[in-house]
Amino acid sequence: MTLASQIASDLLDIKAVYLKPEEPFTWASGIKSPIYTDNRITLSYPETRTLIENGFVKKIKEEFPEVEVIAGTATAGIPHGAIIADKMNLPFAYIRSKPKDHGAGNQIEGRVVKGEKMVVVEDLISTGGSVLDAVAAAEREGADVIGVVAIFTYELPKAEKNFAEAGVKLVTLSNYTELIKVAKVKGYITADGLRLLKKFKENQETWQD
């Protein structure tokens, strides 16, 4: 079993991911979605957590060997980022969604040295907007962001476009395509459910038509 399929399997088993193609969820953006993900739950399962952190370390060493500092997005990327930084013996910082409105008004907590090569850790990629905002904030502080890593991506075309336009490399441990394949094999969804889930990936607006 590949890392992507093992993580997909774990996410389903611990109910970090719910699939309900026949009774869709409504995302904050208003999109009706057959999938809902809460990767924070992975922190409560040591075996899954270890699988994820070891996967991150392996991917970062392969894809970004020149990394000098790990940063997590607030709040979901913080615990994973801190564990990764510890495993790799690297400095750690975290990036707020917006600057503090008191004190020094920091958006980045931790010391970032100008020009340091940074990898940003996120738990989930939908459109990529929030993590790319974090990347921009880190770069304003002088970091050289060489990439983003995440546990899971919905593989939405908008995310692909956003990362391409930002010129930021994205590496994920698992993805939507792998997850729905594993879900069908493990009996989490029916053949008709799989069809709807594939349609959602193709077009998030018309998949229910």
UniProtKB/Swiss-Prot annotation:
It catalyses: orotidine 5'-phosphate + diphosphate = orotate + 5-phospho-alpha-D-ribose 1-diphosphate. Keywords: Glycosyltransferase, Magnesium, Pyrimidine biosynthesis, Transferase. It comes from Streptococcus thermophilus (strain ATCC BAA-250 / LMG 18311). GO terms for biological process: 'de novo' UMP biosynthetic process; pyrimidine nucleobase biosynthetic process. Its cofactor is Mg(2+). GO terms for molecular function: magnesium ion binding; orotate phosphoribosyltransferase activity. Catalyzes the transfer of a ribosyl phosphate group from 5-phosphoribose 1-diphosphate to orotate, leading to the formation of orotidine monophosphate (OMP). The keyword ATP-binding does not apply. It is an enzyme of class 2 (transferase). Its EC number is 2.4.2.10. Coiled coil: none annotated. Orotate binds at S126. Homodimer. NCBIfam families: pyrE. This is Orotate phosphoribosyltransferase.
